[in-house]
Amino acid sequence: MSVLIDTNVMLDIALKREPFFQNSALALAKARAAGDTLLCATSITTLHYFMHKKLGEAGARRFITDCLQAMTLAPVKRSSIQLALGSDMHDFEDGVIAHCAAECGAHIIITRDTVDYAKSPITALTPTEYLNTQ
């Protein structure tokens, strides 16, 4: 099963944000064990920005390198952006991520922001909901 990990879940893990860290980390581990884990290309710059503030440039680059080695990067295509522009999703960034996930064949998006993914072409689950699936 292919699962896309949303930016906010990756930040919860990277920054060890409580009370979200544990379930986010467990959900990522479960997704990796179950198949392909995807990270949208748009997430990379956001992750770098926050990790740079915490770890400095070398640490941020090391973190991004680790992400690229552990996960498949979902490219942002023109079609993903066009679909997001025409979608009923209220948050454009989430729309781009959702359509990238769909175009890459993801089955699930793991996010803490399931409300903004209500009209996503891919089912969105919180880390806790994902942990409770078979």
Residue ranges and their predicted role:
Residues 10, 44-45, 103:
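Alpha-helix N-cap/helix-start and coil->helix boundary motif
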Residues 11, 90, 115:
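Flexible, active-site-adjacent loop/turn segments at secondary-structure boundaries
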Residues 2, 26, 70, 99-134:
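Acidic, PIN/NYN-like endoribonuclease modules and their adjacent C-terminal/linker elements
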Residues 8, 42, 78-79, 110-112:
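Short beta-strands and strand-loop turn motifs
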